[in-house]
Amino acid sequence: MSTLHKVKAYFGMAPMEDYDDEYYDDRGPSRGYSRPRFEDDYGRYEGRDFEDPRRDPRAGMRADLRGEPADYPPPGGYRGGYPDEARFQPREFDRADMARPRFGSWLRNPTRGSLAMDPRRMAMMFEEGHPLSKITTLRPKDYSEARTIGERFRDGTPVIMDLVSMDNADAKRLVDFAAGLAFALRGSFDKVATKVFLLSPADVDVTPEERRRIAETGFYAYQ
């Protein structure tokens, strides 16, 4: 466009369709749907990328070539019904070697293994001539029976003190008395069970094993 035409167009002396400039787009809008000037390619996709691999038998082959796991079932469709056999079979625990022992067996054999003691040795501990053969068990009800304990121990008799039936205050006083008595007469004072103590004279040597056996085999039988 010449300079004259530009001047005419500027003052309205020339038709607008004759005005041509690189900054002006004289093309009118096209009829119908027009594609946006700035398109976003993120929304574009091809249908074959979203095909169900279960319907396409070639999808598993493509997954193997790409190194991707194909965790979908093979083609063939859904198989109804249940399998003939259960997948997990119940285990049987009714074997003879796993039978539970009877209650009486635990009472007859309270100790097993290395702690078990020969019954013959246990009988020898209380036979005539053994220091523990004259052992006695006292079950005081209150602190007033401390005199009886002291007299038995002074005569050289091992004494088992069962303080289970006493209250804690009197039991503590009697324990202090027995400990002082054993110290004065050069004896020994040992605990064999809960609130049960053994007073041994100086000439009676009671080993830890014997004390444990006294507690396990029933010191209540020795009065």
From Swiss-Prot:
InterPro entries: Cell_div_SepF, Cell_div_SepF/SepF-rel, SepF-like_sf. Its main location: cytoplasm. The keyword Kinase does not apply. It is found in: Cytoplasm. One of its GO terms (cellular component) is cytoplasm. Residues 19-81 are annotated as: Disordered. Gene3D superfamilies: SepF-like protein. Pfam families: SepF (PF04472). Residues 36-69 have a biased composition (Basic and acidic residues). GO terms for biological process: division septum assembly; FtsZ-dependent cytokinesis. Keywords: Cell cycle, Cell division, Cytoplasm, Septation. Homodimer. Interacts with FtsZ. Cell division protein that is part of the divisome complex and is recruited early to the Z-ring. Probably stimulates Z-ring formation, perhaps through the cross-linking of FtsZ protofilaments. Its function overlaps with FtsA. Belongs to the SepF family. This is Cell division protein SepF.
